[in-house]
Amino acid sequence: MKKNRERFCNREREFVYKFKVGSQCLELRVPLRFPVQENASHLHGRLMLLHSLPCFIEKDLKEALTQFIEEESLSDYDRDAEASLEAVKSGEVDLHQLASTWAKAYAETTLEHARPEEPSWDEDFADVYHDLIHSPASETLLNLEHNYFVSISELIGERDVELKKLRERQGIEMEKVMQELGKSLTDQDVNSLAAQHFESQQDLENKWSNELKQSTAIQKQEYQEWVIKLHQDLKNPNNSSLSEEIKVQPSQFRESVEAIGRIYEEQRKLEESFTIHLGAQLKTMHNLRLLRADMLDFCKHKRNHRSGVKLHRLQTALSLYSTSLCGLVLLVDNRINSYSGIKRDFATVCQECTDFHFPRIEEQLEVVQQVVLYARTQRRSKLKESLDSGNQNGGNDDKTKNAERNYLNVLPGEFYITRHSNLSEIHVAFHLCVDDHVKSGNITARDPAIMGLRNILKVCCTHDITTISIPLLLVHDMSEEMTIPWCLRRAELVFKCVKGFMMEMASWDGGISRTVQFLVPQSISEEMFYQLSNMLPQIFRVSSTLTLTSKH
């Protein structure tokens, strides 16, 4: 059969088209190799252009060419089919082998015959956890998570104390050395001692880092195994000992004096809430909130001295595997790590509690680095190919060298995502890359940071994130150049752009109601906060309240 098919493939036929121009009879002959791989419309256009054919034959030529290709192709298919049947009849082809080949191909390409994929451990655990957190056992789960949280907090407290003692001891040693500088000691002695101090700090930090990593890994394994066992036991109605295990009271939470010293106190927040309508014909309703708060307040676990420990995680846990996820936007630099700034603070908060569902923040960042490296490599190779095929100049060479030098960095406006189950009110963190340009007062709606917000909102629509927290001024901390006019201009720009993006969302997700939280730094004044609050109803169409009065 294969020989017969090769016989009919790559056969050349001549297409003949006759037409009249005035009193002249002309003939167009074009050799075509079958099967024709090119689109008939494209081939027709090339013939018109190549032979300078008159426009009045364009339609007729296209019909004739299309008909010729279809007829000749069908003839080839018929001859191929007849030759295949003859091969089967003559015994040249094994009928049973042919039938088994067809059956295998059909089974591999048909869904009803496809083998079901075996669920992974993560999928099984997610289903089990979702069932338990929506059952009376939810309090038991949160109690266990809290006990693990206290254990890690104690460990971190011990680490901080030991590091503090080491730094104090090293500070005293350095002071003594500085007093002897120029007398019995030289600059080389000071540098040598500083290097020893740095190495000692690194060794101690690595020791505690490994211990924390090991402890969280053990906790995660114990927790997941316990959740699976609890789910299996709950299915057994004869297990009477389980009812006592589930009835764990909040008073049984373990407290520690050292951990209390590391409590995150809730600072006084300013907050305004609005209900808005967007769209003229297809109206969608959304909730907007303006808050004066630290972005990391939505991540930190909070405690209440009077009533013991109070974790604000019940709603977060209930919606972990739902279609109502919560996210926030962190403004970061172009390096994918957790070594400085808000990235370090965020990583510290993530380490406060073991993540029982997703990889550690460090592991997720390593994956992001590999993805960015692959993407940059692909872009660089394509850019190099385009430069090699076109005209090269100095500017393009500089651009290529710059891309090669920063291939592990993200660009302004790009963002990467991390997933979390161990934060207070957040499931997803968008790490949006911005540069110092956002601190200037002349950014526009086409600025990379603004376009990054648009792409983030689009991801929210496509991945069931219904609550998103955004830094309104595109900064996490205030500085001297951020005057009142600067704040008003920046807030107006972000409000208007987000409004436009939310109107786009109606076409992306069908108009699902969402909550957008605009956060301003805590150092902003109350007067400035209320000016921003008064600006919001002027940009968004706020729902008016209806007052009902009874008639006597």
From Swiss-Prot:
Q: Name one GO cellular component term.
A: protein-containing complex
- Print the keywords alphabetically: Cytoplasm, Endosome
Q: Which residues form the signal peptide?
A: none
Q: Which InterPro entries match?
A: Fy-3
Q: What is its main location?
A: cytoplasm
Q: Name one Pfam family in it.
A: Fy-3
Q: Where is this region: Disordered?
A: 383-403
Q: Where in the cell is it found?
A: Cytoplasm; Early endosome
A biological-process GO annotation: regulation of mast cell degranulation
Q: Self-association or partners: how does it assemble?
A: Component of the FERRY complex composed of five subunits, TBCK, PPP1R21, FERRY3, CRYZL1 and GATD1 with a ratio of 1:2:1:2:4, respectively.
Primary role: Component of the FERRY complex (Five-subunit Endosomal Rab5 and RNA/ribosome intermediary). The FERRY complex directly interacts with mRNAs and RAB5A, and functions as a RAB5A effector involved in the localization and the distribution of specific mRNAs most likely by mediating their endosomal transport. The complex recruits mRNAs and ribosomes to early endosomes through direct mRNA-interaction. Plays a role in mast cell degranulation.
Protein name, entry field = FERRY endosomal RAB5 effector complex subunit 3
What is the species listed in this Swiss-Prot or TrEMBL entry?
Pongo abelii
